[in-house]
């Protein structure tokens, strides 16, 4: 057996849950809308379950969703990834230069007459992904260690740069271009809290799970027994989160369909555009399939939890800015799932004979057609 064969990603045989992921997501979206429209008081009940501006039911779903991917990371390999200056440089430019600039351009192009929605959309573009990217990377057989490192770096930059970038894109750049400006004060602690809760807790759980599991039972047991047992919880947590998000926003989606459409168009262009810009940049810079998948999904996704929290804290829960933040994940989730399948399909074409391509057990044809 060649080394390239040995290093290929070899996920377990596709489970019943994984085989029909698009169907489960569509059903979860529909069920969430149904709950939001049919169960009176549900939105208020869920909205009341908050601590420090964080929705506990949604936080629970995100933590359950993120734990399995972080438990799969081989943390003894992350030091080597962190020293890859080429990978770090490409990711930082895509996340903190290209991403916010593209969202700024799309927001002004599609919402020139809607300053509140436009501001909310720009805030979404500033909130770089630190959560769901772990799921998208895992589904596309990306480099888990690289994704974990990129997410950690995004978290640090989130705390350090969010306020400054908000000031630049809402006040400085519009002023330079002769456009109307927006004044907004972002809470530093809301940003720190979002990072600590939505990344810190599952990251610590993943690290300690691997350390304790390998120490007591060994790596073979941990990776062949324990990880397959907890893997379904990532999808379960994702579906649970989708149901909650759509149930909370059911009224807005139905009562303001035109606003949703106007937000959806630039969001779809943004997610798809960032993904393919990042994929092309990764390919041209010589990265393999797995690292290209990690970089592409890290750059394409956004931290909707932070965008929602900042918009609500700054402009109010019923503001148009907050609506833009809450519509974000409703568009992002189905689009990013579609891009996972696009990555699996394009992988063999863009990266022929790449040793990090998913193995034949996880070939695109099996995933899509089985």
From Swiss-Prot:
User: Which InterPro entries has this protein been placed in?
Assistant: Arsenical-R_Acr3 (IPR004706), BilAc:Na_symport/Acr3 (IPR002657), Na+/solute_symporter_sf (IPR038770)
Q: Name one GO cellular component term.
A: plasma membrane
**Membrane-traversing stretches:** 16-36, 45-65, 92-112, 119-139, 148-168, 188-208, 226-246, 260-280, 304-324, 327-347
- Provide the membrane topology annotation: Multi-pass membrane protein
What residue ranges lie in the Extracellular compartment? 37-44, 113-118, 169-187, 247-259, 325-326
Q: Which UniProt keywords apply?
A: Arsenical resistance, Cell membrane, Membrane, Transmembrane, Transmembrane helix, Transport
Outcome of swapping residue 210 to A: Decrease in transport activity
Modes of activity regulation: Inhibited by carbonyl cyanide m-chlorophenylhydrazone (CCCP).
Task: Look up what happens after changing residue 141 to S.
Answer: Does not affect transport activity
Signal sequence range: none
Question: Which compartments is it annotated to reside in?
Answer: Cell membrane
Any single GO molecular-function term of the entry would be: arsenite transmembrane transporter activity
Please list the residue ranges that the record places on the Cytoplasmic side of the membrane.
1-15, 66-91, 140-147, 209-225, 281-303, 348-370
A GO BP term here is: response to arsenic-containing substance
Q: Which residues form a coiled coil?
A: none
As for what it does, the entry says: Catalyzes the proton motive force-dependent arsenite efflux from the cell. Probably functions as an arsenite/H(+) antiporter. Does not transport antimonite.
Matching entries from PANTHER family are given as: ARSENICAL-RESISTANCE PROTEIN 3, ARSENITE EFFLUX TRANSPORTER
Which family, according to the similarity comment?
Belongs to the arsenical resistance-3 (ACR3) (TC 2.A.59) family.
For this entry, the protein name equals: Arsenical-resistance protein Acr3
């Amino acid at each position: 057996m060649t080394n390239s064969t040995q290093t290929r990603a070899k996920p377990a045989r596709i489970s019943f849950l994984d085989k029909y992921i698009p169907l489960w997501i569509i059903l979860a979206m529909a069920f969430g809308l149904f709950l939001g429209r049919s169960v009176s008081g549900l939105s208020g009940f869920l909205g009341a379950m908050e601590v420090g501006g964080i929705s506990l039911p949604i936080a629970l779903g995100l933590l359950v969703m993120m734990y399995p991917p972080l438990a799969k990371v081989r943390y003894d390999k992350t030091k080597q990834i962190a020293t890859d200056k080429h990978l770090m440089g490409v990711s930082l430019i895509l996340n903190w230069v290209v991403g916010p600039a593209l969202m700024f351009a799309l927001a002004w192009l599609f919402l020139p007459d809607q300053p509140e929605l436009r501001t909310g959309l720009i805030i979404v573009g500033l909130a770089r992904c630190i959560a769901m990217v772990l799921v998208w990377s895992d589904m596309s057989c990306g480099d888990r260690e690289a994704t974990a490192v990129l997410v950690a770096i995004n978290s640090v930059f989130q705390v350090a740069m969010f306020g400054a970038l908000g000031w630049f894109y809402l006040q400085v750049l519009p002023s330079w271009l002769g456009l109307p400006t927006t004044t907004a004060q972002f809470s530093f602690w809301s940003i720190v809290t979002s990072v600590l809760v939505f990344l810190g807790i599952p990251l610590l759980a993943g690290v300690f799970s691997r350390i304790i599991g390998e120490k007591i039972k060994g790596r073979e047991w941990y990776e062949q027994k324990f990880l397959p047992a907890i893997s379904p919880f990532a999808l379960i947590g994702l579906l649970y989160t989708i149901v909650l998000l759509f149930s909370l926003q059911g009224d807005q989606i139905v009562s303001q369909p035109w606003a949703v459409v106007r937000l959806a168009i630039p969001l779809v262009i943004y997610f798809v555009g960032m993904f393919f810009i990042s994929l092309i940049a990764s390919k041209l810079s010589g990265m393999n399939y797995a690292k290209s998948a990690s970089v592409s999904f890290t750059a394409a996704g956004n931290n909707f939890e932070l965008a929602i929290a900042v918009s609500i804290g700054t402009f109010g829960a019923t503001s148009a800015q907050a609506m833009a933040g809450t519509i974000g994940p409703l568009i992002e989730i189905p689009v990013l799932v579609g891009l996972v399948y696009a990555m699996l399909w394009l992988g063999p074409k863009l990266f022929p004979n790449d040793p990090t391509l998913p193995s034949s057990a996880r070939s695109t044809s099996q995933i899509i057609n089985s």
